[in-house]
Amino acid sequence: WDTLWLFLTIIEVCGHTNDVAGMKAGCIIAFVFVLAAWLIFFDARYLNANGFIKSAIIVLIASFWTAFADDICEFLIFGTRQITIKSVNFSDWTSNICVNANVYAIVLVSGIIIASILFVAGGIKAFANKK
């Protein structure tokens, strides 16, 4: 119900003020981020795997969404093709694009490392449970 109410609120507020562009942007942004939340929910609730593997998938979803969700929203709203993470420069923390890219890269690499560790732990646990 919360997802439905989110979209109804966006439609009502923007429709009341005749802000069609705001409604489009709001619905796109809400869809992109609600999709991540629903993927995490379905993984945690319905995936038939142990907790380590579920956690690994959740970490991957969260890190990929953190790294690329803004670029996806920019493309869907404005048609701008950009991959912020391509601007990674760990020696430059002064420009906004480099700071964003550096943070996205750190989150993405950290998420992949953590998820890999969790996948290995999940595999070990699954193998140990089969014996």
Tell where the protein language model's regions lie, with residue ranges.
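Alpha-helical transmembrane segments in multipass membrane proteins, preferentially the mid-helix core
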Residues: 32-54, 66-73, 116-123
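Central hydrophobic cores of alpha-helical transmembrane segments
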Residues: 1-4, 53-65
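C-terminal membrane-adjacent module
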Residues: 63-131
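Hydrophobic alpha-helical transmembrane segments of integral membrane proteins
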Residues: 1-12, 33-39, 111-118
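Membrane-helix interface and helix-disruption motif detector
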Residues: 10-30, 47-52, 74-82, 95-106
